């Protein structure tokens, strides 16, 4: 007989639409929902950027010569290219309508994470320190609710060799980001030798199904029942060191 073994809930929270720069305590808003012990709170990075002043006024952007030349090669707006360059540590690859960069955070992604989607006016950059943002929000929510939670700041990115975007964790607090399961046993009692699970990325992708990419208006998702280990994980734990990157070496 088949029986239920575990149930995981993914709960999307609708918040007001923010244009950027509002003086809002996000933790207090989220804490209005009945949070439970063990909840994982996933927050879209766009919302964090808006509230942390990460939306740049287009009128204040003056494209450099490099940005103008790169805009010609890619077909992108020179002002957008300038912001991409400002947020990049290294340009990895350039093509028609894309610039793959390594950001100052160490993320390798398209366009340094710079985006204009779901932005009222201006150009959005990634949060300056997503791990720090996640930590601050987690501590505030735990203080407000008395519950132990994890917080993930998520972004959606494309992947090499596969089509489509998926959610990933760029900021993490309160849970493991990378779950090392070496030494545990499989179903047949064999010891796991190399298994590391990017559990924070998996949770971010789960949340992204509910958040969506268009006009869903769900920037915060609660994942309940996932049974994820608490810990001191960080989003940066998921970044492969450049010297271990077989594609760039």
Swiss-Prot record:
List of residues binding a divalent metal cation 2: 156, 213
NCBIfam families per UniProt: F420_cofE (TIGR01916), PRK13293.1 (NF009809)
Source organism of this protein record: Methanocaldococcus jannaschii (strain ATCC 43067 / DSM 2661 / JAL-1 / JCM 10045 / NBRC 100440) (Methanococcus jannaschii)
Catalytic EC class: ligase
Record's subunit section: Homodimer.
UniProt keyword annotations, A-Z: GTP-binding, Ligase, Magnesium, Manganese, Metal-binding, Nucleotide-binding, Potassium
A GO MF label: coenzyme F420-0:L-glutamate ligase activity
Cofactor binding description: Binds 2 divalent metal cations per subunit. The ions could be magnesium and/or manganese. Monovalent cation. The ion could be potassium.
HAMAP family per the UniProt record, alphabetical: F420_ligase_CofE (MF_01258)
One Pfam family of this chain: F420_ligase
Catalytic activity: oxidized coenzyme F420-0 + GTP + L-glutamate = oxidized coenzyme F420-1 + GDP + phosphate + H(+); oxidized coenzyme F420-1 + GTP + L-glutamate = oxidized coenzyme F420-2 + GDP + phosphate + H(+)
Metabolic or biological pathway: Cofactor biosynthesis; coenzyme F420 biosynthesis
UniProt EC number: 6.3.2.31, 6.3.2.34
Record protein name field: Coenzyme F420:L-glutamate ligase
Cofactor: Mg(2+); Mn(2+); K(+)
Binding locations of GTP: 15-18, 45-46, 50, 118, 211-218
InterPro entries: F420-0_g-glutamyl_ligase, F420-0_gamma-glut_ligase-dom, F420_ligase_CofE_arc
One of the GO biological process terms: F420-0 metabolic process
């Amino acid at each position: 007989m088949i029986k239920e073994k575990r149930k995981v809930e993914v709960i999307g929270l609708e918040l007001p639409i923010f244009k950027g720069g509002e003086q809002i305590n996000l933790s207090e808003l989220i804490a209005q929902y009945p949070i439970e012990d063990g909840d994982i709170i996933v927050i879209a990075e766009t919302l964090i950027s808006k509230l942390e002043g990460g939306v740049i006024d287009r009128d204040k952007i003056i494209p450099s010569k490099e940005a103008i030349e790169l805009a010609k090669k890619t077909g992108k707006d020179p002002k957008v290219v300038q912001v991409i360059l400002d947020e990049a540590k290294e340009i990895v690859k350039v093509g028609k309508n894309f610039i793959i960069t390594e950001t100052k955070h160490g993320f390798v992604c398209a366009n340094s994470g710079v985006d204009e989607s779901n932005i009222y006016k201006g150009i959005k950059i990634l949060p300056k320190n997503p791990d720090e943002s996640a930590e601050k929000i987690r501590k505030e929510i735990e203080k407000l609710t008395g519950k132990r939670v994890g917080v993930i700041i998520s972004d959606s990115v494309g992947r090499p060799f596969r089509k489509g975007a998926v959610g990933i964790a760029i900021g993490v607090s309160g849970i493991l980001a990378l779950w090392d399961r070496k030494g545990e046993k499989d179903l047949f009692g064999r010891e796991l030798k190399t298994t590391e699970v990017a559990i924070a990325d998996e949770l971010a992708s789960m949340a992204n199904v509910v958040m969506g990419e268009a006009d869903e208006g769900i920037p915060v998702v609660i994942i309940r029942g996932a049974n994820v280990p608490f810990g001191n994980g960080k989003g940066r734990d998921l970044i492969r060191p450049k010297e271990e990157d077989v594609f760039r070496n």
